[in-house]
């Protein structure tokens, strides 16, 4: 119904807008979004294309989005769209780097840049990447929420300040395309999280439940594509919907500080941890053929809890160092927002 409504509505171009860039920007945003979605497999045998460097391909496509967003805001010749475009470009740039470093850590741990092979790695290791690199999973979810500009990172579209942000001047099907692109990127984020951290199309406890008489064969008959869809739907429901209804919008300076000062060092830390895990916890010559790991976890006799414990230790040290600065030093930063005199404390005539 909404699609038909947008389709029949009139599309108008602002009088002094840069018409070419104004018209091209929505198609640039939607096309890059569809390119990401086209790289995501539903199972080991159901996919549109399967290049060996599919993770690198996704990293490259993600870098195009800020360009289209800024062009859309700038070309409209509107102060609200320009402010929204600048906010969006700054936010996407700040969170793009931690996202790319997180994807790089996934490739380092799994030893491949191919999405399907990274899913097979989790099956062979006998553990999802969610448990092998919990910090990476948290970083991926946070950065993807910021990438799709969902609550609480929706400051570029703040209705109370900027009407509709950088897509204020778009109407008709162009507005519908931008609206569609936002949700497609959200669904693509859920699918990518499913493949990178939740084992993709492999069932949970597949080896344990699969060995149960009568129940096991029926359990293993569940199609892999259905498993992926259910996992992605649960990620969308638990993460994106919960965040939308539970969290409040945060200021632009807080968004940028959180991305540059907290997520970026944590992403670099995750890359280092992934390299250590790959070199010392897994056999670099290849994974075992058994479901539960074999050489994967017996290479040095290291227990399964090592990734979780080392992540917690490094996080504790990081936050201790992060909070070492005093309050006066933090408030002296040029981007810190403070109120010298609280509003409403003066009586009329006493300003």
Name each region found by the language model.
Residues 1-351:
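Selective transmembrane helix interface/packing segments
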């Amino acid at each position: 119904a909404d699609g038909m409504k947008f389709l029949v509505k009139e599309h108008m171009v602002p009088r002094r807008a840069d018409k070419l860039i104004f018209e091209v920007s929505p198609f640039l945003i939607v096309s890059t979004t569809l390119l990401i979605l086209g790289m995501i497999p539903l199972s080991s045998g159901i996919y549109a294309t399967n290049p060996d460097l599919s993770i690198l391909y996704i990293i490259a496509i993600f870098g195009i989005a800020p360009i289209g967003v800024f062009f859309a805001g700038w070309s409209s010749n509107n102060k609200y769209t320009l402010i929204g475009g600048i906010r969006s470009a700054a936010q996407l740039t700040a969170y793009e780097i931690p996202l790319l470093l997180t994807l790089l850590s996934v490739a380092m741990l799994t030893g491949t840049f191919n999405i399907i092979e990274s899913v097979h790695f989790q099956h062979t290791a006998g553990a999802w990447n969610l448990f092998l690199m919990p910090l990476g999973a948290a970083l991926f979810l946070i950065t993807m929420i910021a990438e799709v500009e969902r609550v609480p990172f929706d400051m570029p579209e703040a209705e109370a300040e900027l009407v509709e942000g950088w897509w204020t001047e778009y109407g008709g099907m162009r507005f519908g395309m931008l609206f569609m692109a936002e949700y497609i990127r959200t669904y693509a984020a859920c699918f990518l999280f499913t493949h990178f951290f939740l084992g993709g199309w492999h069932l949970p406890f597949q080896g344990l439940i699969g060995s149960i008489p009568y129940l096991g064969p029926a359990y293993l008959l569940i199609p892999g594509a259905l498993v992926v869809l259910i996992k992605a739907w649960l990620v969308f429901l638990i993460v994106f919907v919960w965040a939308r209804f539970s969290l409040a919008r945060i200021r632009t300076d807080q968004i940028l500080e959180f991305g540059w000062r907290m997520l970026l060092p944590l992403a670099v830390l995750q890359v280092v941890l992934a390299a250590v895990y790959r070199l010392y916890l897994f056999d670099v010559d290849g994974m075992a053929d058994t479901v539960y790991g074999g050489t994967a976890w017996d290479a040095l006799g290291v227990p399964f809890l090592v990734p979780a414990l080392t992540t917690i230790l490094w996080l504790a040290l990081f936050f201790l160092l992060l909070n070492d600065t005093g309050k006066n030093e933090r408030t002296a930063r040029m981007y810190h927002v403070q109120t010298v005199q609280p509003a409403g404390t003066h009586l009329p005539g006493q300003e």
